[in-house]
A protein has these predicted regions:
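Conserved beta-loop-beta/alpha segment of the NTase-like Rossmann-fold superfamily
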Residues: 1-61, 101, 108, 112-113
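Short coil/turn connectors at secondary-structure junctions
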Residues: 3-5, 12, 35-39, 51, ...
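A short, charged helix-loop
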Residues: 59-93, 127-131
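Short loop-to-beta-strand entry elements in the cores of soluble alpha/beta enzymes
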Residues: 90-103
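Glycine-rich, flexible loop/turn motifs
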Residues: 40, 49-52, 67-71, 82-83, ...
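Conserved hydrophobic/aromatic beta-strand scaffold that supports enzyme active sites
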Residues: 41, 55, 73, 98-100, ...
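Left-handed beta-helix
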Residues: 104-248
Length: 248
């Protein structure tokens, strides 16, 4: 409703290690989008060749802004070899999925990319209230194209920039991130709500169904997880690629 607002869009499954640095980056981002007609996303320096994340290639630096660059390319979930090349090049950042923009530019992007969606919104906009939101979404959302905000908006807008964030970040949608973010117990294992007997096992992530007893012996750096009668046992670094290969 407020065209002059500056907006931040954030995924819900993210882990921020340094809240103060995160707040500083968001405030810097708001200052940038207030004076630039562009979408701004935030990227993080890769610490490993993670095939489960998206990557952003940095282009030219933006004048008058600290650690902000034009986006040269997006790559979604590359294989491990490409992820390693990206990390070693120094040109790529992990895509956090965080997006900032001013209301005017965001509105213009949506009108350019999704004219039918905006036409429906315009029809109800004068009297649209929060109480109407659920009804509107239930009636209209199923008919919209199945597009992620990355592919539907970020990769198609004319002006997209990336800020180099420094707040420490993990996407909790990967097993490796769960290992990094959860507290570790005996042998540096992360046992997630599971009953397990550990024998000479270290640096593993273990998640079993309630009522299932697991005995893990001689493993180092593995994922052992069961859900809906599917058992996954693999090295932590291979989990994202394997899940994508066999599940998707």
């Amino acid at each position: 409703q407020c065209a002059d607002a500056n907006v931040v869009i954030t995924p819900s499954d993210q882990f921020v290690l340094n809240e103060e640095a995160f707040q500083h980056n968001i405030e810097e981002g708001f200052r940038f989008v207030e004076h630039h007609q562009a979408l701004l996303t935030i990227g993080i320096t890769p610490t490993r060749p993670e095939p489960g994340y998206g990557y952003i290639q940095m282009g030219d630096a933006m004048e008058g802004a600290t650690e902000v660059f034009r986006v040269k390319s997006f790559t979604e979930k590359p294989d491990r070899d490409f992820a390693k090349v990206f990390m070693e090049s120094g040109e790529f950042l992990w895509n956090t999925g965080l997006i900032q923009a001013n209301g005017h530019y965001l509105n213009s992007c949506f009108r350019q990319l999704f004219p039918d969606v905006m036409k429906r919104l315009d029809a109800v906009r004068p009297n649209f209230t929060l109480e109407d939101e659920l009804e509107f979404v239930s009636e209209n959302y199923p008919s919209y194209a199945n597009l992620s905000i990355d592919r539907g908006v970020l990769e198609r807008c004319d002006e997209v920039c990336v800020m180099h964030g420094n707040f420490g970040w993990a996407d909790l949608g990967t097993w490796h991130a769960i290992y990094e973010c959860r507290s570790r117990g005996e042998g540096d294992n992360v046992v997630v709500d599971s009953e397990v007997i550990l024998d000479e096992s270290h640096n593993n992530v273990i998640k079993l169904p309630k009522g299932r007893l697991g005995i893990v012996s001689g493993l180092d750096g593995y994922i052992v997880a069961e859900e809906d009668n599917v058992l996954l046992i693999c090295k932590k670094g291979d989990s994202s690629a394997l899940v994508r290969k066999y599940v998707n």
